[in-house]
From Swiss-Prot:
Biased segments, Polar residues type: 395-404, 416-450
Family membership noted in the UniProt record: Belongs to the G-protein coupled receptor 1 family.
Protein name: Tachykinin-like peptides receptor 86C
Keyword Zinc-finger attached: no
GO molecular function: neuropeptide receptor activity; tachykinin receptor activity
Gene: TkR86C
Amino acid sequence: MSEIVDTELLVNCTILAVRRFELNSIVNTTLLGSLNRTEVVSLLSSIIDNRDNLESINEAKDFLTECLFPSPTRPYELPWEQKTIWAIIFGLMMFVAIAGNGIVLWIVTGHRSMRTVTNYFLLNLSIADLLMSSLNCVFNFIFMLNSDWPFGSIYCTINNFVANVTVSTSVFTLVAISFDRYIAIVHPLKRRTSRRKVRIILVLIWALSCVLSAPCLLYSSIMTKHYYNGKSRTVCFMMWPDGRYPTSMADYAYNLIILVLTYGIPMIVMLICYSLMGRVLWGSRSIGENTDRQMESMKSKRKVVRMFIAIVSIFAICWLPYHLFFIYAYHNNQVASTKYVQHMYLGFYWLAMSNAMVNPLIYYWMNKRFRMYFQRIICCCCVGLTRHRFDSPKSRLTNKNSSNRHTRAETKSQWKRSTMETQIQQAPVTSSCREQRSAQQQQPPGSGTNRAAVECIMERPADGSSSPLCLSINNSIGERQRVKIKYISCDEDNNPVELSPKQM
């Protein structure tokens, strides 16, 4: 060191180190000028050795290294033309991701018919993607584009924490969806996941993600690097007890654990689950599969599983290059000094973050009900119909009843002429959600004075959102009356689900 660095720089860095680590009571800086080079180097070594812990020692080493061997110029400066291109690419991606996931959030929370078990998982996935796009991607992109962190130490900690939490939550939600679909398809006789159980699962997912991301709250830090030309830059990184990237083994071990728990194991689990589901859905035909009811149920299940296979496949494709790049960079440190490393990192990071943009597009492409609501709000924004109002499930049910009045009037006379006598009673809830189904219960003639025929019309509209309505037709007075029945709706597997009054 004494042959590379001149004495004046050694003395200046020693003075800065004494002030930086508050050692004025131990070292008299006024006497440093009278020391020779060997004595100054010895003093610098003692400053490092007398630190309290390993973290403080690494901090002192980094400080003295930056002071004694500063870079001649500030590196990683992209021309403004390249910055503009990257800003446009990232800006479009973040706009689509935030807008798309925001619409999904509105669709599920604002429409009772969309609050199914599967859609609750999709809602959680959209929340994670929305947080990633707004709280992490924007700030990380600015940091990578300018190679400078201008947002301070507190948000450096928040940024690192949010990044790991949102990624972990997304992949754990995909695993939960695969388990839910697996039970529904491979073991259809088992009890389905209730909404209350889904809420508990989602809370556990967020809690586990926070636990995995806790080290980011403890070890996130910032550091300012200075250069000969007077410029400087601030970096946000993880300062572990044994140092920082790329020399820290703790940093390598933590990132390897995150890779295994949030990518390796989940991908294997989901591959197994969807393979077993595919064997059931697209494998050998079961007895009675050609019936209308079973064919309709099988077709609906295949559509849902096909959509989730697309979501998982896109997730794996988007994140694989990002993970492979960091594994390679850990074992080949010279890659950080290559000419196009910043473009490589920006490209891999954009691909990983674009997963948040693609998910809403998959919902639009492969789910009719999501597509209907997407088209409504897109049309409203494009045309400028700000006063357009979406009907609630109850108002849609009223409109459906109004449209069927003419049909009821025509069938009234037919029921008057009927010799069949039935007693007004509750109509049974049928076991399938067909487009239109009627159920009648009959009694022997002359069994009662109050005679009426009961017809239960369970008609599902195009969006599948309205509950069925059962009507009775009174023979004696020729009027229709509503029969009190349990309202049901259709879940994602095209099976009836009983609704409480709060859900109707």
